[in-house]
Amino acid sequence: MKYYFAPLEGITGYIYRNAYHNLFGQIDKYFTPFVSPTSNEGFTTRELNDILPAHNEGLPIIPQILTNNAEYFIRTVNALKDFGYDEINLNLGCPSGTVVAKHKGSGFLSEREDLDRFLDEIFSKSNAKI
């Protein structure tokens, strides 16, 4: 059996993950709180702190992206690959009302044609494991 550590908003940042890993370990993958790319390139300070390799040494980290924009997703994947990440998680499960209202997370699932186009584009333009 594999054990995956899912993020809880505002709680399971890199400090918590490191403390948990040092005390308990036995987690196969730690998923980061989501990165939510916008038209502004780069990461917020919080996002950067959560994904910096120096803040996650020895942890099997999977960065998570929350977007419905293929261009932003691909740009963010490339930035994450520059940090050494080769596996990325696309968040299609967040049920938060503010996220769903923007047709992101689980809200993107109801937009089948848009989701199909999005997936076609990201899989054709990215070689990361998604």
Regions found by a protein language model. Give the residues of each.
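Structural preference for beta-strand elements that scaffold enzyme active sites
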Residues: 2-4, 29, 60-64, 87-89, ...
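Glycine-rich, positively charged N-terminal anion/phosphate-binding segment
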Residues: 8-79
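Glycine-enriched alpha-helix->loop->beta-strand junction motifs that scaffold or abut catalytic
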Residues: 24-28, 84-86, 126
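Non-cysteine beta-strand/loop elements that form the S-adenosyl-L-methionine
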Residues: 32, 85-95
